[in-house]
């Protein structure tokens, strides 16, 4: 088979869409597309009807080119010379690039001088997890400058000033808070939190006082009994006017009061009761 027949056989192969089991392929040109040489995965097996035609093409194809690729052309064809000139460079791109470790060094041989600094503050470790920084497999270390929020210890002088301020104002204003912070050598946040906690404590104490002041029975206190017994057959206790100091005792006062047996404020009236029994009404 001469070069002309081989060229027409290759052209017929690219024109037939069933050879690659794809859609219609455009006309074959002298410069084949570069994607034919960039594929890394092996192509699917050829259909049985083209096995005989491809067998003749495999004899003249180089070992590095797949049977589906363009067969070699004659040396006098300029397209074939151009194809063989660019073939080694295109096949060299299919190899993977060298690894990131130069000079054949292993990944375990490299040691990180400093561990990766975490960009976000919430990703840093706290003092509660500081033991993880000593673990050999830990991905982070506990930073010494990282301070965990601790409980503020107020002095007696500071507590005295704060209690005095709370006695007058349950809610402190911003200017007064700044003034107290400068005077007591505290921050505004410390004073704000102290007043919040103190208000909660004060509310709990007030609720406890209200609950303890109300009796369990739910009723109010009993009223004192009045010393007044009004019966139909008894005499009423009358309170006569007090005698003038150093004066004579009025004639209506009984002898028991004169002798001091009864208190001078209370006495039995000698006159009979003015309350008369009710008479039943006669039917009309």
Swiss-Prot record:
> Which one Pfam family would you cite for this protein?
Homeodomain
Q: Where is this region: Transactivation domain?
A: 13-73
Q: Which PROSITE patterns has this protein been placed in?
A: HOMEOBOX_1 (PS00027), HOMEOBOX_2 (PS50071)
Q: Where is this motif: Antp-type hexapeptide?
A: 119-124
Residues in the DNA-binding region are 147-206
Q: Give all Phosphoserine modified positions.
A: 269
One annotated GO biological process: response to xenobiotic stimulus
Motif Nuclear localization signal per UniProt: ranges: 198-204
- The biased composition feature labelled Polar residues covers 50-59
Assigned keywords, A-Z: Activator, Cytoplasm, Developmental protein, Diabetes mellitus, DNA-binding, Homeobox, Nucleus, Phosphoprotein, Transcription, Transcription regulation
**Region described as Disordered:** 30-116, 202-284
Question: What is the reported tissue distribution?
Answer: Duodenum and pancreas (Langerhans islet beta cells and small subsets of endocrine non-beta-cells, at low levels in acinar cells).
Can you say what this protein is called? Answer: Pancreas/duodenum homeobox protein 1
